[in-house]
Swiss-Prot record:
Gene: pecM
Localization, UniProt: Cell membrane
Transmembrane segments: 6-26, 38-58, 60-80, 86-106, 116-136, 138-158, 167-187, 203-223, 231-251, 261-281
Domain (EamA): residue spans on this chain: 12-130, 149-276
Protein name according to UniProt: Protein PecM
Pfam families for the chain: EamA (PF00892)
Membrane topology: Multi-pass membrane protein
Keyword Methyltransferase assigned: no
Keywords, in A-Z order: Cell membrane, Membrane, Repeat, Transmembrane, Transmembrane helix, Transport
């Protein structure tokens, strides 16, 4: 098996974030967790490497901001103002946004199977979560929508732009994590004080988020994007709430209702369709993400 075949690793690991955050990290420090997920891993990966071409710096910053920096900041802003289920529901719209952007920016045709998978996954998310009866915070809804659009745009632009000639995937991942961390850093410093005490349990949680949850996850994610369309990758995101649900059931004594089990069936149906789309795309020989040979002035 090749790295591209492990694209599912990233959304599965990201599905553990809520469990790790609530069980291992200091309370009410989400931006610090986001910063530690991005900046240290990025520095490790680019340390000692050559600088990218000058014309690529702005592209790497845009990709890092969309895929990581803006996404994390908006996501945590929304999480403080909305129930987690609402954030997940808004996030389930991401595949539909990616389908539209792929059509507009990559001229990829819209397939019926893509739409069916996106709708099936969205229905599954609705069944997994419980929506509140109280009015929703408008600012939280806007932030959640911006987080969803940010990651969707980052996926499509990463596919469109590729990566600089001669740059390895690890280094490409590192630059995005580094640039994303630079976006998060001033927001964290201005809005969130550091914790008074950091325990060994906290350190273990931060280490997990930084290495398996970020460095390895984003490396696998971008490697998968080389061989698959952004639509397929966005549909794999439905794995995250499934993993979160499973961890809650196994370790947090959270029960499973009949509706949630039906939701699991819908999401698995969407993932089966994703596999079918992937096989179809490979037969059609969709051009993979390549290193860019263009000279940018």
């Amino acid at each position: 098996m090749k790295l591209k075949d492990f694209a599912f690793y990233a959304p599965c690991v990201w599905g553990t974030t809520y469990f790790v955050t609530t069980q291992f990290l200091p309370a009410d420090k989400p931006l610090l967790a986001a910063l530690i997920r991005a900046l240290p891993a990025g520095i490790i990966l680019i340390l000692g490497k050559n600088l990218p071409p000058v014309g690529w710096l702005w592209r790497l910053f845009v990709l890092g901001a969309l895929n990581i920096g803006v996404f994390f900041v908006m996501l945590f802003f929304a999480a403080y103002r909305l129930p987690g289920g609402v954030v997940a529901l808004v996030g389930s719209l991401q595949p539909l946004i990616v389908i539209l952007l792929s059509f507009l920016l990559l001229t990829q045709p819209v397939l019926k199977k893509q739409m069916v998978a996106a709708v099936a996954g969205g229905i599954g998310i609705v069944l997994l979560i419980s929506l509140p009866k109280a009015p929703l915070n408008p600012a939280g809804l806007v932030a959640s929508a911006l987080a969803t659009m940010s990651m969707a745009s980052g996926l499509v632009l990463t596919k469109k732009w590729g990566r600089p000639a001669g740059m390895t995937m690890l280094t490409f991942t590192g630059w995005q994590l580094f640039c994303g961390g630079l976006v998060i850093l001033p927001v964290q410093m201005l809005t969130e004080p550091l914790p008074d005490l950091v325990t060994l349990t906290n350190l273990a949680g931060y280490l997990y988020l930084a290495i398996p949850g970020s460095l390895l996850a984003y490396f696998m994610w971008f490697s998968g994007l080389e061989a698959n369309s952004p639509v397929i990758m966005s549909l794999l995101g439905f794995l995250s709430p499934l993993v979160a649900l499973l961890l809650g059931f196994l370790f947090l004594q959270q029960g499973l209702s009949g509706a949630q089990l039906v939701g699991v069936v819908f999401i698995f149906s969407a993932l089966i369709i994703v596999q079918d789309i992937s096989l179809f795309s490979r037969r059609k020989k969709v051009k993979p993400l390549e290193q860019s040979d263009c000279v940018i002035k």
